[in-house]
């Protein structure tokens, strides 16, 4: 019996990792992934419905690694961001 509980829990964990996110928000709320807090899904939902609810997000996407700069090399990433901001 105990082994079935452990296996069930392990299956839930594996499925959560496979899906990439565990969302524990009420049905009228959605997960704000930056703050891991639940927010109203639309304007018809009262904010108190979602308060005190949190969601856990596991981001499995790999970020592209930036190459290491040699000492004294110019890092122009902030300049690129400034150019993109001025174009927007």
Curated annotation (Swiss-Prot):
UniProt-annotated stretches for the region Disordered: 66-88
Q: Does the keyword Disulfide bond apply?
A: yes
Query: What does UniProt say on post-translational modification here?
Result: Contains 3 disulfide bonds.
Which keywords accompany this UniProt record?
Cleavage on pair of basic residues, Disulfide bond, Secreted, Signal, Toxin
Keyword hit for Translocase: no
Annotated Gene Ontology cellular components are: extracellular region
Please give the chief subcellular localization of this protein. Answer: secreted
Residues forming the propeptide are 79-88
Query: Which region is the signal sequence?
Result: 1-24
Q: Which GO terms describe its molecular function?
A: toxin activity
Q: Which domain of life is it from?
A: Eukaryota
User: Which subcellular locations apply to this protein?
Assistant: Secreted
Tissue specificity, in the record's words, reads:
Expressed by the venom gland.
Q: Tell me which family the UniProt entry assigns to this protein.
A: Belongs to the scoloptoxin-XY family.
Identify this protein by name: U-scoloptoxin(XY)-Er1a
- Name its species: Ethmostigmus rubripes
